[in-house]
Structures are given as structure tokens and as C-alpha cells.
């Protein structure tokens, strides 16, 4: 097996077939990924995680583990919406991965100083499925009691938020960083700011162990490196298994595909 991306699966080809073979092996790429993941579940502190994307259900287990391990959590992407809602901010017509109200309320109460949510967002109206056709773009600042209208969606973190996130990182002297999921609608150039700022934070903290993973955040970081003519390797280590990364963290590395290889 040479793919972290499938190790969380309980499929027969991943977790059962290796048990029938006398000769099983962990691939070089998978070994590299595991070494990176071990540095996340046994982090050098202080540590920070930038969590974006949409599906809370894919990230909530890892989020809890990261908090328990002392990580500062910085929220972006549509992941921001249930957290904003939990603090009674009006999220208008923004996408919401529902069903997590209770656990998010508890996390915000238990780790209020560790979970950082946006204070401003960039919004727009999406009247079709074409992600390039977003109209009436504007910023909404929650600290000024501004609200997202029912016909609007939050599509990126705002400049005040990313400034605060950057300042927090600088103040803490972060030694371990991870990013999973984009901070905005990166398919549309108007909403790449948040993801680009995360990439810039990674670039400016070369003293830290840095790993980012997931198709969209990898794409966002690659766009950043090309647009600003920066060597992508200067942004840290790229993991090709976004959900695999999350499941490794959530389960402390105890994944079906790895158990089958007896590599832990």
C-alpha cells in the first residue's frame, strides 16, 4: 500500500487482502506521509491548524483531537458558517453543514481561546451553479453589527480576519502548522484572498514544520505559488490525502489500511 488516501477505508482490497499475503509492504510515499502525520499527532508546540472547506462531518473528529493536543484553530471556508451561527451571527443564505450545533457549541465553550472564527467575510449573490457568476460582492464586518442578507453567501474570509489570524501566528511563535481545506471559493478569482493569505503565512513561517493537504487547498497553494512566482516547496510539505490526513489525526493513526500492514 502506498496511498494514505485509502487507508481509512475498510474495503476488502485495503484491509483484508493484505492479511492473506505473506509479503506485505508499506510504500515509500506512504511512509513519508506517516512520518508527517506523526509530527501532527505529536506536535511541537505551539501549533496551529487552518481548517476550511465545507464538510464539518469530515473534520470534526480531527478538530477535537487537535484542540486536545494544544493546537490553535483558525476557521475558514464554508466550515466557518456553523461556527458563526453558534455565536448568533446571521449567515444569510450561506451553505451550512447542519447537525453539529451541539458539539460546536460545546467546543466553543470549552476551547473559546483556541478557536478563532472570522470577524468579517466577503459575500456575494450566486444566482446559478456557475461559480464564475457571482454578483454584488461586498464585505460584511460582524464587529460593526453588519449582517449577511438572505440572498447572499459568505464566500471568503475578509481582510480583518486574515490580519488577526496572521497576528496571532506571529504572537505565538508557531512551530507546527497544518492546513486542510480552502478558505474561500477558489474557483473564482475574487474569493482566493483567504486561501492565499494562509499560503503567505506558511511562506513566512519557514522555521515551523508545515504540512497542507486536500485537493482544493493544494490547488489554492499551487495557484498562489504560480501567481506570485514562488517555489511551491517553500510553502511546506504537501500531503496528497486531505481526508486521509484528517482521519489519521482523528484516530491517532489507527486506520484499517495501516493495521492490515502492521506498520504501526
Task: Give residue ranges: language-model regions.
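Active-site loop-to-helix "anion-binding N-cap" substructures in soluble metabolic enzymes
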Residues: 1-264
